[in-house]
Regions:
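Short alpha-helical transmembrane segments in multi-pass integral membrane proteins
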Residues: 1-21, 78-145, 191-247, 303-368, ...
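N-terminal transmembrane alpha-helices
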Residues: 8-40, 44-45, 58-73, 77, ...
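Small-residue-rich hydrophobic transmembrane alpha-helices
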Residues: 50-110, 147-166, 277-335, 339-341, ...
Length: 466
């Protein structure tokens, strides 16, 4: 068994989680920087350009959702096989990332190219921003296959206990995007000023470079995997298992996208200034949210490995440490955002109307981010335990079943401020619900001794050779 994978079951938990989390957090922050950097430079084009990016953002979240979900399914399955000592099955599962990434990426490209206008109408685009949003949507979707591959390949490599190479993929792409943005958006030097098209093109080029780095790692024998041609051939049963386990992560992201679609439609009644304000607030908050995703990415293979090895005590210790650590970090980050909200918003826009709307949106939205963190950890835990239905329910509850109704209710009662307040209100309710689920599962497993007697999930055995 690869040494890195063995460490998931033997290395001291604090140092292991820190070693896995730091590169993973760096990688997810780098991913988030695509949108943040685009917004920073696009803000020079006016608030309508920012609003166009805000409208397209939910579609981008859906693309990321599929990549994150597929990656989570691969990670849970592969780390569990490592825990059981079945390296051949781990390689077989890993080989499916190529087919899955290509299929999902091409699907999103086709949808954006063929149905841009109805998609934008559904996302709440106002007439004055539709053309800019259409250009940005179509061009960025050309990079969808590369983006999905980066996310899935990164999760696969991370499942073997290697968090550094996924970080390199993400950061390389992000740095390239930051370098290209001013040249292509503003037309520096020999480059033409492409405006919002330049922002989209810079993102696509950067994503393609990140994907090429991932290909080099996987096919150049730079990881713990030894993927052969027989592993790459699509395996319908194995693909179904990956999708089943990864669906909660996708749903968690997709419901966030659907929630923002509803949010955008509510805010569109207040004009493009309100859309620009939420675009800025969400991108700034999204950057703060990325460490949560990074830590959950680190936790999932630890849970999966120790579940496969039957080490229940270590599994729950990892969950507890992850929750405490990320909640403390988010509490400190909340203070920074609350104190420096005007300065943070000022990085994106100097329009007085937009700033006046975005500052309270950011402050109110960030008030409860420390309560979001454990909910995401709990979803990752249930994924690692192959409890897909429970993870799916929690993912649906967080954004869709609670947040969306509160947005409509609070906006009706208190207007624009009510829409902002719906965010921390829903986060608080969901924390209470998700904690009840995870505590019940913990007590049940302690009482039944399932960690000693657990049997492999029969549904997730299709990657075995017969």
């Amino acid at each position: 068994m690869p040494d890195r994978a063995e460490q998931l079951g033997s290395a001291p938990l604090p140092s292991l989680l820190l070693r896995l989390s730091v590169p993973s957090v760096a990688a997810t922050v780098a991913t988030s920087l695509y949108n943040v950097v685009d917004t920073l430079f696009v803000s020079w084009l006016g608030h309508q350009a920012i609003a166009a990016l805000a409208v397209v953002f939910p579609y981008q979240i859906i693309v990321i959702a599929v990549g994150v979900g597929t990656g989570a399914g691969v990670s849970a399955l592969v780390s569990r096989r490592f825990g059981e000592g079945d390296i051949e099955a781990a390689n077989h599962a890993g080989g499916q990332v190529f087919f899955l990434s290509a299929c999902w990426g091409v699907l999103f490209l086709f949808l954006a190219a063929g149905f841009a206008e109805p998609i934008l109408a559904a996302l709440g685009a106002t007439p004055d921003i539709t053309e800019q949003a259409r250009l940005y949507l179509i061009i960025t979707s050309c990079g969808a296959p590369a983006l999905v591959f980066i996310l899935v390949a990164g999760s696969l490599i991370r499942a073997s206990g290697d968090a550094v190479r996924p970080m390199v993929m993400m950061i390389a792409a992000s740095v390239l995007n930051m370098v290209l943005d001013p040249f292509l958006i503003l037309g520096i030097g020999p480059f033409p000023a492409l405006g919002i098209r330049g922002a989209a093109l810079a993102t696509v080029v950067a994503q393609c470079i990140g994907a090429l780095i991932g290909l080099y790692y996987l096919l150049g024998l730079r990881t713990s995997f030894r993927i052969r041609s027989s592993h790459v051939r699509p395996d319908p049963r194995l693909i179904a298992d990956i999708c089943r386990v990864g669906m909660p992560a996708s749903v968690q992201e997709v419901t966030e996208s659907l929630a923002f679609i509803c949010f955008n439609r509510v805010l569109s009644g207040y004009g493009s200034v309100a859309l620009a304000a939420i675009g800025i607030a969400m991108r700034a908050a999204d950057l703060a949210f990325m460490p949560i995703i990074g830590v959950s990415n680190a936790l999932l293979p630890v849970v999966g490995y120790n579940f496969g090895a039957g080490n229940e005590k270590r599994l729950w210790s990892a969950v507890r440490l992850s929750c405490i650590g990320i909640m403390a970090a988010m509490a400190m980050l909340t203070v920074v955002y609350e104190v420096f909200a005007p300065q943070i918003v000022g990085l994106f826009s100097h329009d007085s109307e937009v700033v006046a709307a975005a500052v309270p949106a950011l402050r109110i939205g960030m008030a409860s981010i420390a309560l979001i963190a454990p909910n995401v950890m709990f979803v990752a835990t249930f994924q690692g335990l192959s409890m897909g239905k429970t993870a799916l329910l929690l993912a649906l509850t967080r954004q869709f079943l609670v947040f969306v109704p509160l947005v409509y209710l609070f906006e009706h009662l208190w207007g624009l401020t009510g829409a902002w307040v719906a965010m921390p209100a829903s986060d608080t309710l969901v924390f209470i619900i998700s904690f009840g689920f995870i505590y019940r599962q913990y007590r049940l497993r302690q009482q039944t001794g399932v960690g000693v007697t657990h049997q492999p999930d029969p549904v997730a055995r299709s990657d075995r050779k017969t």
